[in-house]
């Protein structure tokens, strides 16, 4: 073997391999919209919103709650509840096995997390869908956790906010999942009767039984920028009506323009703007007014 091969080429290859292995996985992320390559720690500072094109990337339920609620005083509701395969359902795979796989992938027991806490000092209860858990589909546990959050709002007379991200009802639970549409709608009717605010935040995507029930029953309905919102997907509708749909059909901007939602708020502004809105809806001081009053005192 020549000295050149031993002295130059082999060490060069070894240095290259060491350099490759020293770069942690997941350190870089490509924006699915503009394809910009983004440094993960910097992306976290923008709450997973692309700084180049403002694309709002999908984030998990706990991440949403973490960036929305105050850090102190949180308590999870219904964390002990776990889904059960009562129908012994099987399509290409047993439902029980699908649940096990989803739980292992996400670290969650089901597709909704409910938590009480405070928003800029204001008592509140929040629910958030975990889209990575079987597409955020709504089954018995999702419905029950949502109802427990609403009942907490009723008992404590505090506002409720829900972040929806779902493909709809969970087909593996058949009529049990469809019943959750009525169940969640009924408890929201009680909130309205009691004059307790419910704000629905629609994130990408919201479809099916969730969009046809709780997601569209907010006193105020907010969409994140360019979120997909509808009942059936655009391709299904086009195949049914045999017509080309308008540009941006089912995007939050299209829905706002046609009066289906009330506001579009960027992720970084959700916390302060919803705090002000809820303070006005409940007759409390806004965070700004509270700070001014404290400064004067």
Swiss-Prot record:
Binds 1 zinc ion per subunit. Keywords: ATP-binding, Cytoplasm, Fatty acid biosynthesis, Fatty acid metabolism, Lipid biosynthesis, Lipid metabolism, Metal-binding, Nucleotide-binding, Transferase, Zinc, Zinc-finger. PANTHER family: ACETYL-COENZYME A CARBOXYLASE CARBOXYL TRANSFERASE SUBUNIT BETA, CHLOROPLASTIC. One of its GO terms (molecular function) is carboxyl- or carbamoyltransferase activity. Its cofactor is Zn(2+). Pathway: Lipid metabolism; malonyl-CoA biosynthesis; malonyl-CoA from acetyl-CoA: step 1/1. This is Acetyl-coenzyme A carboxylase carboxyl transferase subunit beta. The gene is accD. It catalyses: N(6)-carboxybiotinyl-L-lysyl-[protein] + acetyl-CoA = N(6)-biotinyl-L-lysyl-[protein] + malonyl-CoA. InterPro entries: AcCoA_carboxyl_beta (IPR034733), Acetyl_CoA_COase_Trfase_b_su (IPR000438), ClpP/crotonase-like_dom_sf (IPR029045), COA_CT_N (IPR011762), Znf-ACC (IPR041010).
